[in-house]
Amino acid sequence: MKIQSTPPAGLNPAIATPAPPAAQAPKATLSTDPVGQSLTSALKSASGIVIKDQLPDIGRIKLLTPLPQGAARTVAQQVGQRQLTLREFDNGVAQLELSRPPLTSLVLSGGGAKGAAYPGAIKALEDNGALDGIRSMSGSSAGGITAALLASGMGAGEFKTLSDGMDLISLLDSTHKKHKLFQRICTEIGNLAHKYLPKVGSFTQLILNVLPRVQSEALPLEKVIRDESSKAVLNQISAHPQVVSQPAVAAIAHKLEQGGAVTFGDLKLLSQHIPQIKELNITGTAMYEGRPQMVVFNASLTPDMSIARAAHISGSFPVVFKPVDEQAQPFQAEGEHTAFKDGGVMLNVPVPEMVDRAFSTSPLRQSDNLILKFEGEEGVAPDRGARFGGALTDWMVGAPVAARVILQNEALAAHDDQTVTVPLKTDKGDFSTTFGGTLNFSMPGDIKNHLQERLDQAVSGHLETRAHSREQYTFGSMEAALNALDDDMLTSLAAQNSAQAGEVLQFRQQAREVFSELTVAIVAQNGTPAALTFNDQMRTAFTQLDALASNPERKEWLAKELNHADNVDHQQLLSAVRGQAVESPVLKAAIEEMQVRTVAVVAENIRKEVIFPSLYRAGQPDSNVALLRRAEHSLARATTAAQVNQALDDIIDHYGARNKPWSKPLSSTTIEMAKAWRIAE
């Protein structure tokens, strides 16, 4: 069963910021996807989360790993693709060193016209041979527009030519002739002001460019993205003639040649055959009855949606762009219309792990992101309610922007070694501000080149550093270290005559054979009208798994594998037997693991949906700040439903009035939300 992050009410499966039942009517049935899956599948559901420094699974943290002591015995030296080195010390502690995992994901932040720097990053990736290794691209706002073009197979040179030559102002023009004429006249006056009034001309030009285009429908922008992405995909198909023999690829090519649009499903299929084409994730902000919720468009949620349409939605900068009305998407009810705003409102830096809480069988990272965020966005987080400017922004946008930015920046700290800050404060000026960067749609070509060169240098430096970086992990035993390795790493160790690695490989092979038998038993029952029950065939499988769990490390590995995201059948079984008396140690451990994951996701979303929006409302007194921080601390360590409810009850019982002479609020969104988020024990 998919772990949901909401109270047990209906839920829109597209959203990543779920609403409790008191705040929003049901929009769809609960998803049955498993927990902790890849970004592409997880973004279809509502378990997207933004968390502080990737809060640890406290319930699964054991005593601190002892420090290595005594002499070290080298078990393996620089083996395998990641040049793994494994040592064992006299006190039994094992130490693992290996190179960084492959770079497979590019994350592009929103920033309006600041995105003019992005061609520098793509050039650096291409020059360093890293672009083809990128398998997915994720973008918000202007980053979503960039991601759509790049995921279509556009190379660094093509992208720079398009980006540098794109007249962003004209792409915001109205389709009505008289209105468009007025907009062009204002632009020409602005150009003259810039030329003849050096002190105030730039600002005047900006105002005359933007104000006449406020609430633009930006249809020309969507058309450019549609046309250019189609051209890029067709160019890649032509460059790989061998793939045209695939009927599905030929069908896509025919559709595009007839004027059709590139869809998310097209990119997913083509990415399996053409490395230059990537899977794509683009954020949008859905305004459900005034309540903002993040939606991530991708091949899992919206396979038939035009990527140009999604990029238009994501780039709909508040006030400047008119909200985009969307209907007939898989996550919408029949006849439902939803207004969308800029994807950066809810998450401007859409890092996969900040959207989908990853649960793994190993602490070792299997892949890396390259995260591009713009200089000047860090700031220092206040400890409470937004200042006037932040409160005004929240009101204008209709979303808790201040709280979301702080959540985002705290979560990004956990990905610092995967992040490159786009340089915007240079000797040629400060392009990190709203007027100097975000809305500077008439940025001169020499400035664009300058910013691109700076970013090229920054990304190249990052790639050079990560190529020589080594990660180090310490484990309490050699068994724990070996169980943290993937099969390829274990095979490399076994080839170096590591008998223990061979034993772990054999254990996994035997376990997977039993897993297959268990799956057959579950599928067989699913073919009958009766509810899933724990039968003799399943009981036999778990008896075999119990025998394989010859030590705590192997039992833990089995429990986590049974909770693996890709196996819906095992998830279904664990949900069916939860709450029943269980004899199998492995099954009991797997159920406990599922419960810990459920609680972790729910607790994190309470922090995101209840605590932070309340914490950053204007006028919070010290008592409320202390209360909310205490609840946050408790939720970070919660492993049971009772502990989650205890933290919520603390808020319900002690939350005070803001800016009022009386102590208790007459009505409170925070208290009502806390009540709605209580979960069954």
Task: Give the location of each predicted region.
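Non-Sec secretion/translocation targeting segments of pathogen effectors
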Residues: 1-37, 41, 679-681
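Small-residue-rich anion-binding loops in enzyme active sites
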Residues: 29-107, 284-290, 634-646
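Extended charged low-complexity segments that act as oligomerization/scaffolding linkers
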Residues: 48-70, 89-98, 156-198, 381, ...
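Patatin-like phospholipase
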Residues: 62, 82-83, 90, 99-107, ...
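Active-site gating loop/helix substructures
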Residues: 208, 246-360, 436
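Short secondary-structure capping/junction motifs at helix and strand boundaries
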Residues: 231-251
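C-terminal helical/tail subdomains of lipid-metabolizing enzymes
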Residues: 347, 374-376, 397-681
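A short alpha/beta connector and helix-capping loop motif
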Residues: 350-377
